[in-house]
Regions:
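N-terminal glycine/serine-rich phosphate-binding loop of ATP-dependent small-molecule kinases
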Residues: 1-94, 122, 222-231, 359
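Active-site core segments that coordinate phosphate-bearing ligands/cofactors
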Residues: 6-7, 19, 112-125, 135-168, ...
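Phosphate/pyrophosphate-binding loops at sites that engage ATP/ADP/AMP, CoA/4′-phosphopantetheine
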Residues: 60-72, 144-148, 194-198
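Short beta-strand-loop/turn "lid" adjacent to the catalytic site in phosphate-handling enzymes
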Residues: 66-99, 127-133, 162-183, 206-209
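Short, acidic/turn-prone active-site loops that include or flank metal/cofactor-
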Residues: 97-104, 260-262
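Short alpha-helix plus adjacent loop in nuclease-associated cores
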Residues: 101-113
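A conserved helix-loop-beta module that forms one wall/lid of the active-site cleft
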Residues: 191, 197-210
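Glycine-rich phosphate-binding loops at beta-strand->alpha-helix junctions
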Residues: 209-217, 262
């Protein structure tokens, strides 16, 4: 009987459960469950629906039971930087705000009161992006200081789902590095930096590496899904898992991972935290086996995903692409990487405004 292994891959627009097993020396992958994802407005903030998403994770496990393919182990990967803060009773503090929310506006300047951008990059090797965990935490500190006072635990999104599955609190390395608070030298939290910024040390769990066993399903989840398995931390940052899957047999390769974001880069054995790299805004995200994903963040499918949502998902992605191909006379060129497209009210309106002002043509 085949041994099955379950990957739960949750992106910014959808999630999927994929079962894998070996057959005649080859890995066979089977998607068994899929669900929608996206941010919703709550109290004026763009938030993730983590309660609903976790129900979908559990529903996918129930699907395994239904089809008679019980996995030996599983792990969850997601996008980077976002997190929850838990109080002493493990309750989420505040809204589950997502990285496209505007709460981080101006927070870079607050961080730079404690450390310059140049010195911050030299310490972490992570790109300047206003949505990084370091700036999100500064927004919490400035706008809801009571949350930091009450917080006992910080968990990034995949770590939070692993906690809900097992009851065990962990922080996986590749995901943690995206937040700009981890040292590429020690491969641990930069506690000196954390102290400089006034973030409570006690929130930050010990980092674990990909491949670390976290634990078995809790009694509650085991009873609900009808079986038990081991939860093992993958490279929980989705790009980390994608790069690990690149079919390259040597170190000399370039990868492009495309989803809501597109990431283009290489693998390195050491981080490049030079001033030149800082000026180019390249990032050194943690990878498997202590390597670094030296890459550039590029706008991916977010714009077409947003256009689809603006028309209430009336068309499939294939239909939207077909309509775009039919509109051959399209005179403008748009800089899709411009920050105005990070979280506009509507992508189509932003493009029209840009076209009128010639700002991005």
């Amino acid at each position: 009987m085949a041994a099955y292994y379950l990957a739960v891959d949750i992106g910014a627009s959808s999630g999927r459960h994929i079962l894998g097993h070996m057959e005649n020396g080859k890995m066979v992958l089977e998607e068994i469950y899929r669900f929608e994802n996206g941010m919703v407005k709550k109290d004026g903030e763009l938030c993730w629906e983590f309660d609903r998403l976790f129900k979908e994770v559990v529903n996918g496990l129930k699907k395994c039971k239904e089809i008679g393919k019980i996995p030996v182990s599983m792990g969850v990967d997601t996008w980077g930087v976002d997190f929850v803060l838990l109080d002493k009773d493990d309750k989420v503090l505040g809204n589950t705000v997502g990285y496209r929310d505007h709460r981080t506006e101006g927070m870079d300047k607050e961080v730079y009161k404690a450390i310059s951008l140049k010195d911050l990059y030299a310490r972490t090797g992570i790109q300047k992006a206003d949505y990084n965990t370091i700036y999100q935490l500064m927004a919490v500190k400035k706008k809801h200081p009571e949350y930091l006072e009450q917080a006992e635990t910080l968990l990034h999104v995949p770590d939070y789902f692993h906690f809900l599955l097992t009851g065990q609190k962990t922080c996986e390395y590749t995901e943690a590095t995206t937040g700009q608070l981890v040292s590429p030298i020690t491969k641990d939290w930069d506690y000196e930096l954390i102290d400089m910024l006034g973030y409570p040390r006690k929130m930050f769990q010990k980092l674990i590496m990909p491949g670390t066993g976290i634990g078995h399903l809790s009694d509650k989840i085991r009873e609900e899904v009808g079986f038990d398995l081991e939860v093992v931390a993958p490279a929980t940052h989705d790009t980390g898992s994608a790069v690990l899957a690149v079919p390259a047999n040597d170190d000399d390769f370039i990868y492009i991972s495309s989803g809501t974001w597109s990431l283009m880069g290489i693998e390195r054995k050491e981080a490049d935290c030079s001033e030149k790299s800082c000026e180019m805004n390249f990032t050194n995200e943690g990878g498997y086996a202590g390597r670094f994903r030296y890459l550039k963040n590029i706008m991916g499918l977010w714009m077409i995903q947003s256009v689809r949502h603006e028309v209430n998902d009336a068309y499939s992605f294939a239909e939207i692409c077909a309509m775009a191909e039919e509109a051959k006379d399209f005179p403008s060129r748009v800089d899709a990487n411009d920050e105005c497209f990070l979280s506009p009210d509507t992508v189509s309106y932003t493009h029209l405004r840009a076209h009128e002002t010639d700002s991005y043509l």
